[in-house]
């Protein structure tokens, strides 16, 4: 037989005439995690425990009020209240919307500090004093 003799209609039928079916069902991992939930400045600390790949758990921060600020001169950490977000190199819009990400400059009770942790991944805000 010649290959040109076969009529190939839509992609819903096989050359034998049988129906084409779904190869596999949609897996949860293929759907993705949805839009990013970036931690915001809030009235108090809000954390969420989520199941992640491999059945592990991850503590994510949704809202933050306090940060662990490292004071280089005294070589110690201080739990300080976050007053505001000064700037965010990752995205200038984040500072206006009060999003806290790694690298953001925050104003605390003890002075300005740079966030060194990833709050959305670690569930805690660690920062180093720059003033």
Swiss-Prot record:
Stretches with biased composition (Basic residues): 16-30
Family annotation (InterPro entries): Ribosomal_eS8, Ribosomal_eS8_CS, Ribosomal_protein_eS8_arc, Ribosomal_Se8/biogenesis_NSA2
Superkingdom assignment: Archaea
Pfam families reported for this sequence: Ribosomal_S8e
Gene3D superfamilies (UniProt xref): 2.40.10.310
Listed GO CC annotations: ribonucleoprotein complex; ribosome
Annotated GO MF terms: structural constituent of ribosome
Similarity-based family: Belongs to the eukaryotic ribosomal protein eS8 family.
Subunit structure: Part of the 30S ribosomal subunit.
HAMAP family linked to this entry: Ribosomal_eS8
Protein name: Small ribosomal subunit protein eS8
